[in-house]
Amino acid sequence: MAKKDYYEVLGLQKGATEKDIKRAYKRLAAKYHPDKNQGSKDSEEKFKQITEAYEILTDDQKRAAYDQYGHAAFEQGSSNGGFNGFGGGFGGFEDIFSEMFGGGFGGGSRRQHVVRGQDLRYDIEISLEEAVKGCKKDIRLSTLAECDNCHGTGAEAGTKVENCPHCHGAGRIRRQQGFFVTEAVCPSCHGTGKKIEKPCHSCHGDGRVQKAKNLSVTIPAGVDTGNQLRLSGEGEAGENGAPAGDLYVVIHVREHNIFTRDGANLYCEVPISFSMAALGGEIEVPTLDGKLKLKIPTETQTGKLFRVRGKGVVSPRGGYAGDLICKVVVETPVQLNEEQKELLRQLEISLDGKANHRPQQAGFLDSVKNFFTHLGK
């Protein structure tokens, strides 16, 4: 029996666009799918014709050959036009296809279409102390897990799971058309290689259901915002027994009311009094391990930085510890009584005109004076 024109099979004209071909295929495949027409040989044959037409017409090279030579382009022994030299068999081409598909045209290693589970993301917020020292956190998330009722088979308990009659359990369909070989996911079983007699009532044949899962996550010392922890196999369950995906825990460190962080170093501002800045002394500064004493030299200016070695963050990679960097801020006294104000006035009078007591101010005034001098020239 002569093969029907591929365009006619899909109800299209020869100049149909790829979009038209895909639309027609989806409509007809849904209509004649074997699952909807069980036992109907006519529907099964029609479905095969539709699938074959779709595979040829959606491949640019095959479609061009078909438009020029018709079905003869895909017949063994054809010597039409551009296919001269391939008549009488495939010779070395069969070896090439064997390497590509793992065997000869009719066999080879066939594998089911397995889909690894999706990776999941979980965002977690921790304190700076937890980030620096490490901690354990219990988390709860919702994910697709193996169905307890069917144990991932997708079939109702007590019912059969048979090999798909269309791909014979391979999950993929391979066709030889002339010197072309095509391999695609079986449209009947969608790559599972199985035919489920009665789908599981819990998972509706998917083999997976949505479940809540509790996990304990160990967060190592030294992590920072944006770091990710990968928990292998804790993502969604895979399809048809495929491996589960992974879970990525994304770290977010809360802002601290005292410290800021830059890499392995911690920073803080330490207020000191006007008199201590001038006379020097000793103050207590906070660290994540407790308090420590810091010596303030005489004549300390606001903004001066003091580095405390090893009191920062331990790097999770190198093992070295960063530093704590304290920035001194000299506080201006407020809410002074008259006696205190008078003492400050006396101090101001005693310092007036003596540049060595105000080196920064003197330097600034000299710079301003020079600026206006040059501006007037």
From Swiss-Prot:
Superkingdom is Bacteria
User: Which Gene3D superfamilies does UniProt cross-reference here?
Assistant: DnaJ domain (1.10.287.110), Heat shock protein DnaJ, cysteine-rich domain (2.10.230.10), Urease metallochaperone UreE, N-terminal domain (2.60.260.20)
For binding Zn(2+) 1, which residues are annotated in this chain's numbering?
C147, C150, C200, C203
Quaternary context: Homodimer.
Q: What is known of its domains?
A: The J domain is necessary and sufficient to stimulate DnaK ATPase activity. Zinc center 1 plays an important role in the autonomous, DnaK-independent chaperone activity of DnaJ. Zinc center 2 is essential for interaction with DnaK and for DnaJ activity.
One Pfam family of this chain: DnaJ
Q: Name one GO cellular component term.
A: cytoplasm
Q: Which UniProt keywords apply?
A: Chaperone, Cytoplasm, DNA replication, Metal-binding, Repeat, Stress response, Zinc, Zinc-finger
Protein name, as recorded: Chaperone protein DnaJ
Q: Which InterPro entries match?
A: DnaJ, DnaJ_C, DnaJ_domain, DnaJ_domain_CS, HSP40/DnaJ_pept-bd, HSP_DnaJ_Cys-rich_dom, HSP_DnaJ_Cys-rich_dom_sf, J_dom_sf
In UniProt terms, what function does this protein have? Answer: Participates actively in the response to hyperosmotic and heat shock by preventing the aggregation of stress-denatured proteins and by disaggregating proteins, also in an autonomous, DnaK-independent fashion. Unfolded proteins bind initially to DnaJ; upon interaction with the DnaJ-bound protein, DnaK hydrolyzes its bound ATP, resulting in the formation of a stable complex. GrpE releases ADP from DnaK; ATP binding to DnaK triggers the release of the substrate protein, thus completing the reaction cycle.
Q: Where does Zn(2+) 2 bind?
A: C164, C167, C186, C189
SUPFAM superfamilies, sorted: Chaperone J-domain (SSF46565), DnaJ/Hsp40 cysteine-rich domain (SSF57938), HSP40/DnaJ peptide-binding domain (SSF49493)
* Subcellular localization, as worded in the UniProt entry: Cytoplasm
Q: Which GO terms describe its biological process?
A: chaperone cofactor-dependent protein refolding; DNA replication; protein refolding; response to heat
Cofactor field? Zn(2+)
Do you know which PROSITE patterns this protein is assigned to? Answer: DNAJ_1 (PS00636), DNAJ_2 (PS50076), ZF_CR (PS51188)
This entry's Gene Ontology molecular function terms read: ATP binding; heat shock protein binding; unfolded protein binding; zinc ion binding
Zinc finger feature spans (CR-type): 134-212
Q: List the disulfide bonds.
A: none
How is the cofactor bound here?
A: Binds 2 Zn(2+) ions per monomer.
Family classification: Belongs to the DnaJ family.
